[in-house]
Amino acid sequence: MDTSSPSAFVNGALLRRFIGQKVRTVIQVTGSEIGSVVGKSTDDLQIVVRGSSPPSPLTTYLEVIGIAESDNAIRAETWTNFGNTFDTQNYNELCKLANGEFKHLFI
C-alpha cells in the first residue's frame, strides 16, 4: 500500500475539515454534466466532483479520491465505480471512526 500520499475518509459533513487536502469519499451519483458529477454523500449532503474524466458508464455509487476544494466540492484525481448497491450507513460510520476515536489506526 502506498502511504506517501494519504487521503482522509470523509462524508459530506467532514469534508469542510479537509479543504486543500487529499480526501476520499463515496457518493451516490445523482447527476452528471460535462466536467462534473453531482452526488449525495453517505450522510445525505450534496457533493460536486470535478476534474479528470470519470469512468464510463457511471454506476450508482462512485468512490472519489482528490483534493477538497470547498465544503461541498472535490477536484478528483481518481474515480472508481463501486457498483449499484453499497452500504452507505457502514461507510458513514467508517468516516466517523477514521476521524474520531480511532483516528490513530488510519493513515
Curated annotation (Swiss-Prot):
Q: List the disulfide bonds.
A: none
What highest taxon heads this organism's lineage? Eukaryota
Where does the protein end up? Nucleus
List, in alphabetical order, the Gene Ontology terms for molecular function in this entry: DNA binding
Q: Which GO terms describe its biological process?
A: DNA recombination; DNA repair; DNA replication
- Per the record, residues carrying N-acetylmethionine are 1
SUPFAM superfamilies xref list = Nucleic acid-binding proteins (SSF50249)
What are the protein's UniProt keywords?
A: Acetylation, DNA damage, DNA recombination, DNA repair, DNA replication, DNA-binding, Nucleus
Q: Which GO terms describe its cellular component?
A: nuclear lumen
Q: Which Pfam families match?
A: Rep_fac-A_3 (PF08661)
This molecule's function is given as:
As part of the replication protein A (RPA/RP-A), a single-stranded DNA-binding heterotrimeric complex, may play an essential role in DNA replication, recombination and repair. Binds and stabilizes single-stranded DNA intermediates, preventing complementary DNA reannealing and recruiting different proteins involved in DNA metabolism.
**Family that this chain belongs to:** Belongs to the replication factor A protein 3 family.
Subunit info here reads: Component of the heterotrimeric canonical replication protein A complex (RPA).
Protein's name according to its UniProt entry: Replication protein A 14 kDa subunit A
Question: Which organism's genome codes for this protein?
Answer: Arabidopsis thaliana
